[in-house]
Amino acid sequence: MNAIVALCHFCELHGPRTLFCTEVLHAPLPQGAGSGDSPDQVEQAEEEEGGIQMSSRVRAHSPAEGASSESSSPGPKKSDMCEGCRSLAVGHPGYISHDKETSIKYVSHQHPNHPQLFSIVRQACVRSLSCEVCPGREGPIFFGDEQHGFVFSHTFFIKDSLARGFQRWYSIIAIMMDRIYLINSWPFLLGRIRGIISELQAKAFKVFEAEQFGCPQRAQRMNTAFTPFLHQRNGNAARSLTSLTSDDNLWACLHTSFAWLLKACGSRLTEKLLEGAPTEDTLVQMEKLADLEEESESWDNSEAEEEEKAPVTPEGAEGRELTSCPTESSFLSACGSWQPPKLTGFKSLRHMRQVLGAPSFRMLAWHVLMGNQVIWKSRDVNLVHSAFEVLRTMLPVGCVRIIPYSSQYEEAYRCNFLGLSPPVPIPAHVLASEFVVVVEVHTATRSNLHPAGCEDDQSLSKYEFVVTSGSPVAADRVGPTILNKIEAALTNQNLSVDVVDQCLICLKEEWMNKVKVLFKFTKVDSRPKEDTQKLLSVLGASEEDNVKLLKFWMTGLSKTYKSHLMSTVRSPTATESRS
């Protein structure tokens, strides 16, 4: 967790002061924090707790080193600090903990070494012990802003027989720049920090009771003459927290507690990437996979039943193997889930547009988007496979029905992408139909008849492509909106192929959302035509080509989505809400 935990104290002589703070370091340690220690000067006490290796380093400094370190420190000068304002001795390099799991270091000093962090901690300390306090001056509170960070502060009192009111004022603060994370960590921080405070108060109370038993101070103070001038009682108005708790290892224990607090608080909340609801393409693919699994299970069951029946083999049938013919449904599902191999041919839509030419590509793309049958006739099976692989990216998965290569013509209701060998005849009424486009691939007589000068691929330069249709798309026809946007993306050379692919995905999602709205409006709610026209105008799809595209894409909606809509509308709760 990227935060700073600090212990603050309100000194009677100097006001709010930071006593001890622990910060998280993801980068190498700063100079002066446990660096340059020789074996003779360093005492290391290491222990394992919660996956953190605790290391406390103490070294003896010469007076010159102490003076230089004091002048370079962003904290207050020695002359501005009393015993109650100081935690670590002069020259103490602080405490360091190494987290072996994450390679993170937790470093504790009296003040942060970075000037900006020192300013943030200093301001939070002053506010926590002056204006930002809860009623009763003891308890948790939250404050902060985007510039100076957000602070969780818990103020508390420590018993002191020599202090005014027999107690001194402290606070433990946790500073973060992430407001939401800090608020969500409030229950955890509150429970753990209260545990630390209770332990400190229990130790101080034992010392307080011992001092009161040995030399009661209340009667002595009541008998003392009143004076308007501030003065030190018994010559020791400022006492350190170690003397108040009688614990010489107090700062090492606080470092351990603060380091564990930072590690545990950062581990309990993690960020997860939420991908949202599955798209229609994902739902359709899942349905097709489920259908294939069902079909394979049915085939396995039928084979098992045939084996149990154990039919007697008739004479003359030996040596012959009978194979079952796949049903039409299995054939269609196999066509829908067909995955072509990655072979040479068309690389992308931009590649195909450059090879076919802009007019021919626009005609072909228009028929693809409208749901018309696209027939490729070529002897090169790999070329047909690559063409279908590229063209199918313009359609939702549910609208794609492919027969990659057939020895006979297949009707349009069975497939909208059909690959044929050149000798296969196509019926005359199909060739004259406005709902069919045919791409014939011939061998070019000269290599420069139809060069494929794109993407350094000359494998298509030996072919000549002829695109024909019974209803050619006029050059001045507006066409569907998505086709114009696709062409604009393909002609923009500043966009790479990967960017164009992502743009195509976004366009399909945009228009599939319009399809869902139209399906709900017309099929589920059964609205009149006048309302449907108004809806199409709102969706920006009132043109004829856009309407045809929406109706075709409606066939690609998943069964899951359709059944969910129908069950929601027909449920009693939905009926009551509509009424």
UniProtKB/Swiss-Prot annotation:
GO terms for cellular component: cell-cell contact zone; centrosome; cilium; cytoplasm; cytosol; FNIP-folliculin RagC/D GAP; lysosomal membrane; midbody. The modification Phosphoserine is found at residues 62, 73, 302, 406, 537, 542, 571. Residues 63-76 have a biased composition (Low complexity). Residues 493-558 form the dDENN FLCN/SMCR8-type domain. Residues 31-82, 294-323 are annotated as: Disordered. GO terms for molecular function: enzyme binding; enzyme inhibitor activity; GTPase activator activity; protein-containing complex binding. Belongs to the folliculin family. Interacts (via C-terminus) with FNIP1 or FNIP2 (via C-terminus). Component of the lysosomal folliculin complex (LFC), composed of FLCN, FNIP1 (or FNIP2), RagA/RRAGA or RagB/RRAGB GDP-bound, RagC/RRAGC or RagD/RRAGD GTP-bound, and Ragulator. Interaction with FNIP1 or FNIP2 mediates indirect interaction with the PRKAA1, PRKAB1 and PRKAG1 subunits of 5'-AMP-activated protein kinase (AMPK). Interacts with HSP90AA1 in the presence of FNIP1. Interacts with HSP70, STUB1, CDC37, AHSA1, CCT2, STIP1, PTGES3 and PPP5C. This is Folliculin. It comes from Mus musculus.
